[in-house]
A protein has these predicted regions:
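Gly/Ser/Thr/Pro-rich low-complexity, intrinsically disordered segments
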Residues: 1-193
């Protein structure tokens, strides 16, 4: 990924977040990166910032705690909101700032997925941009705190904005944030039954 640093186009290599389902049936949030034909999961993100020179390319040795990512499947999104019970909100390290379209510090429609200590899957969506009066949406910090209040020990921000929508038995639960309140066509959806 490229960003402008001191007037020059600069390559960065951020670790990115994934909500993983492992073979033993457990869910976890991880930061991952594919290096040398192997995908590694990390306990911590590479501590990048678009205001500093880029860090090394993630590998087996960097950042610390690398292990082979052995999940059965995963949902890539970001940033991580909660990891191991701690609010992380790693949008700076994942370079998911205003330039990325995430708008982490402004109220926006948001979607998130999380897991509680006892294995309950939490799916969350909120509308925003005043589609309903006095409902501005949430910042990523507010979303992280809410997912923590729901009991999540791991949680991940999913695509928000006009992509935030939840249907239950075919019925919308919020007003999507376009003029017609219609669902935006998206390439990937999450189904639960």
């Amino acid at each position: 990924m490229n960003r402008i640093l001191e007037g020059k186009k600069t390559a960065y290599y951020p670790t990115r977040s994934v909500f993983s389902l492992y073979k033993d049936g457990t869910y976890h949030v991880d930061w991952i990166y594919k290096s040398d034909q192997q995908t590694y999961a990390y306990d911590m993100p590479a501590l990048n910032s678009s205001t500093r020179p880029p860090l090394s390319v993630p590998s087996k040795g960097f950042p610390r705690g690398a292990k082979v990512w052995s999940a059965k499947m995963g949902i890539g999104a970001g940033p991580v909101l909660i990891k191991d019970g701690m609010i992380r909100n790693s949008w700076v390290e994942e370079l998911l700032d205003v330039a990325s379209g995430i708008n982490p510090q402004t109220c926006q429609p948001r979607s998130a997925i999380g897991i509680t200590q006892d294995g309950k899957l939490i799916l969350f969506v909120c509308e925003g941009r005043e589609q309903t009066p006095d409902v501005p949406g949430m910042t990523l910090d507010q979303l992280a705190r809410l997912m923590k209040a729901f009991g999540c020990v791991d949680a991940l921000n999913l695509d928000g904005g006009g992509s935030s929508c939840m249907l239950i038995n075919g019925k919308k639960t919020i007003k999507p944030c376009n003029k017609e309140h219609q669902q935006r066509p998206v390439a990937t959806v999450l189904f639960a039954r």
